[in-house]
Every structure is written in structure tokens, then in C-alpha cells.
């Protein structure tokens, strides 16, 4: 056992540990809780989208569809998990895909609004349809990729984190380097954020397998990025006072995010990895008389 780094633990002592879920290739309770929460939010958003399409004018016309679809979305998740339990990492993969799709939809929508004349802008029905479509497609893609290719909660969350931070840093640095008096400044910044979002997603998918972080490590990385941005940006504004330059502030904030992410990466480098359990087949046993 020492050679194989194996230990014996009573099942009762595992509690909410992911060990049992990983061994059985079943989603953890934490994953499912996050998926239920996001499915309700998706249902509420779908209700809002429908109210825009139908041009609902009463409070009931707006609220009731959202409530029904919010509860219905959670019911669909429960039905799927009851019929065919989600595999380990799949719920988080769905959530990551949903968030990526939402971010894509928002950025593309506002980029389009920024690049065209006011009379060519999309109507609310088109805007909400694009955002809803990207969100739904992202959730579906995340579920398919997670189920077919196999993943872990940490890997799936890592992809969402790399894409978000890449978009944020790219957008802020572009803001700092762009002449904000230029009429095309806003669409340039939004397009840069879109490129950063997709580059981060691709980079995250390529690196997730080798990094294979636990979801706890991903949260620490996010904390590092948030803390670094607040620290650097806050200190700059505090030091400059009334003479604060907006472009310098966003550049320093972006630098702080990168520094915070890098620091968190180094500090968490010793955390254990979250590898999938590879199923093995038992070796054949033969018996011979002696």
C-alpha cells in the first residue's frame, strides 16, 4: 500500500469528499448545487427573453413565465440526473459553457451596438435572442464536451476562469492604449475583449489537462486576480487623488490582476491535482493443481 500510495478510509469518514464521486464517476453534490442554481437563473432569463419577444405589458406577463421556467429548468436537471446520473465534472462543464456563452453573447451584442449607427442597432428582441442563444448553445456544448471527453470540476472551472481573466485584462489594457475620444474606441475595446475571451478559453482547454487543478485552486486563482486588481488600482487612486488619470488607472488595475493571478499560481502550485480515475480491468487469474 505504501508503494502505491494507497490508504484505507472508512466510508463514513469521507463525508462530502469527492473521492467517492470520482471513483464512481458521478457528479459531486457541490457540482450539482451549482448546476441547479445556474439552471434556475437560466430559466429566469429565458422567461425574461420570452416576455421581450411577446412584448408583455403586465407584471404577471413578465414574472409568471420566469417563475415557471426557473422551476422547470431545475426540474429538467433533476430528471436528467435521476434517469442518467451526471458523470464527474459534467455539471461544472455545463455551467462553464453556460457562462462562456453568456459572456460571448453579451460582448458580441454590445460590440454590434457600438460599431453601427443608432438607426442600425439591434432591437431588444434581437439583442436578447442573441444573448439567450449563445448562453443555451454554451450550456449544450459544455455538456457534450464534458460527457464525451471526460473532465473534472477543476478543469472545467479552470477554462471559465482563464477565459474571463483573459477578456478582462485584454479589455482593460486596450482601454488604456486607446484614444477614448475616438468614435471607434468602444467597439475596439469590446472586440479586444472578445478576442481575449476566446483566446483564454482555448488556452484553458489546452492547458487544463496538464494543470488539472482542483476547483479550490481555481477559486484561489480567482481570488488572487480580484485582490491584485483591487490592491494595485486602489493604491494608485489613493496616491494620485484628484489627479488620477483614468487610462493609467485601468492599466495599473490590469497589471495588478496579472500580478495577483501569478502570485496565486505560485502559492497554490503545491496543491494536489484533480485527476480523473482511470478505470482498469482486473487481470485474469488462472488456477493450476499442485
Q: Where are these predicted regions, by residue range?
A:
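Short, highly charged
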Residues: 44, 48-56
Amino acid at each position: 500500500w505504501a508503494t502505491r500510495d494507497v490508504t484505507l478510509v472508512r466510508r463514513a469518514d469521507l463525508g462530502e469528499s469527492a473521492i467517492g464521486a470520482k471513483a464512481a464517476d458521478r457528479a459531486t453534490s457541490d457540482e450539482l448545487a451549482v448546476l441547479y442554481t445556474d439552471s434556475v437563473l437560466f430559466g429566469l432569463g429565458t422567461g425574461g427573453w420570452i416576455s421581450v419577444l411577446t412584448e408583455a405589458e403586465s407584471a404577471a406577463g413578465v414574472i409568471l413565465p420566469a417563475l415557471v421556467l426557473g422551476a422547470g429548468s431545475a426540474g429538467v436537471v433533476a430528471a436528467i440526473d435521476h434517469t442518467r446520473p451526471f458523470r464527474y465534472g459534467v455539471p461544472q462543464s455545463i455551467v462553464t459553457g453556460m457562462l462562456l456563452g453568456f459572456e460571448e453573447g453579451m460582448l458580441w451584442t454590445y460590440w454590434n451596438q457600438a460599431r453601427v449607427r443608432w438607426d442600425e442597432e439591434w432591437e431588444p428582441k434581437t439583442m436578447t435572442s442573441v444573448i439567450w442563444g449563445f448562453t443555451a448553445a454554451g450550456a449544450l456544448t459544455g455538456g457534450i464536451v464534458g460527457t464525451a471527453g471526460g473532465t473534472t470540476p477543476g478543469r472545467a472551472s479552470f477554462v471559465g476562469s482563464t477565459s474571463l481573466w483573459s477578456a478582462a485584462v485584454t479589455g482593460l489594457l486596450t482601454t488604456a492604449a486607446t484614444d477614448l475620444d475616438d468614435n471607434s474606441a468602444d467597439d475596439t475595446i469590446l472586440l479586444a475583449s472578445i478576442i481575449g475571451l476566446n483566446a483564454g478559453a482555448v488556452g484553458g482547454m489546452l492547458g487544463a489537462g496538464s494543470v488539472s487543478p482542483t476547483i479550490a485552486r481555481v477559486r484561489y486563482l480567482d481570488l488572487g486576480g480580484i485582490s491584485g486588481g483591487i490592491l494595485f488600482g486602489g493604491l494608485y487612486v489613493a496616491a494620485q487623488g484628484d489627479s488620477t488619470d483614468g487610462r493609467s488607472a485601468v492599466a495599473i488595475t490590469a497589471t495588478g490582476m496579472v500580478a495577483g493571478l501569478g502570485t496565486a499560481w505560485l502559492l497554490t502550485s503545491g496543491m494536489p491535482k484533480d485527476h480523473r480515475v482511470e478505470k482498469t480491468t482486473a487481470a485474469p487469474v488462472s488456477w493450476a493443481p499442485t
